[in-house]
Amino acid sequence: MKVVFTMGGITHYLSPLLDNVVRKGVDVVMVIPSVKDNQTIGKGVKLVNNEALYQVRYSEIKQGWYGKTILTDLKTILNEEKPDIVVLGWPYFLQYFFDRQLRLLIKENNIKLIIREIPFQVPPFGQLSYFKENPVYDENMILQSRGMSFFIRALCTMYIRKFVYKHADATINYASCAYDILPSYGVNKDKIFVTYNTPNTESLIRLREKVLSAPPLLEKKQRILHIGRLVKWKRVDLLIDAYAKICPNYPDSELTIIGNGPEMENLQYQAENLGLTGRVVFVGAIYDPFTLGQYMHESSIYVLAGMGGLSINEAMCYSLPVICSVCDGTEKDLIQDGVNGYYFESGNADSLAKSIEYLLRNPQMMKAFGDVSLKKIQEEINLDTVS
């Protein structure tokens, strides 16, 4: 069986997943832009270009009249590769809607169509009121879900999704919230396949064994850890505010922030103004997996105060309890409130501080939560189960 995937680029976590799919007997062809497509790959996201078991085909791109990227060579590649399945994600499934020739090519060649998305910021069909409780912000925390033009685009996108999903043979989704959302677009639940998103957990757990046997890197403390690019929508400022509320009660605690980004100076200034110099440690970016593993192993709690990614999975590989808010939906399949972490009220520093303090006061609970985190990775959401 041959499958063509369309992506904006090959991320460091996607590559081992695709290799694993190939090992299971699937011929995989990745179609990616010949230049980085910033519309589909966020700033600072690490891309790879190394040897792999799957094939890579490059396509020229252009911006469609509707403002999103088009893979101009996609039809040619499909004609040449003759796949059994084509997998289209955002924004490339818009190309399926607007390009009648692409639709005919897929139909005439009996190519099965699969749509792939989280879904994130996708309301149930017809429910524009969704955006009142789930406002859309960009990376700089500027509100996007306002004004007539936004809601007209959102309504049009709903109908486009409904059309595309009607013609899809199946969907691949990263989060189980797909079971609640996609049926409103006419998708039968038996066509929805949740595969979750994961880093290379096999590699991480092997590395963990080496980290466990290595001498400590850091002074022993109750360490609260955050890893991620320092941009506004990660809400590291909220985490610092929350820590300021509890740190006087925990003199042996430390907030460690790993990552670089445009908000670094602002966050350092915030910590200094709150009297947290020496208590909030900005490490900068760490690219060495072993060193990163040491930081996770020698921490007590992992906190994601805003939008996140696979850092939750990675922290769970190191038996960490996780505190987060509801973000893109993927966290709901990883973190069970009161079992291996806590959810706090989004944007509420008091709520976040309360969750952190509760775990700091209960080290046995931290240990139990961390054990559940690791078990969930080992048994449920790992490289093998999602591929």
Residue ranges and their predicted role:
Residues 265-286:
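Nucleotide-activated donor-binding/catalytic signature segment of Leloir-type glycosyltransferases, i.e.
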Residues 285, 337-338, 342-349, 358-364:
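Conserved acidic donor-binding segment of nucleotide-sugar-dependent glycosyltransferases
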Residues 294-307, 320-321:
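Acidic donor-binding loop of glycosyltransferase active sites
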Residues 4, 216-234, 238-243, 256:
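Conserved donor-binding/catalytic core segment of Leloir-type glycosyltransferases
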Residues 252, 279, 351, 358, ...:
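A short, well-ordered alpha-helix in the C-terminal region of glycosyltransferases
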Residues 313-317, 327-338, 342-343:
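Short acidic/histidine- and often glycine-rich active-site loop of Leloir-type glycosyltransferases
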Residues 285, 292-299, 315-316:
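Short alpha-helical donor nucleotide-sugar binding micro-motif in glycosyltransferases
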Residues 150-213, 314:
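Donor nucleotide-sugar binding/catalytic pocket of nucleotide-sugar-dependent glycosyltransferases
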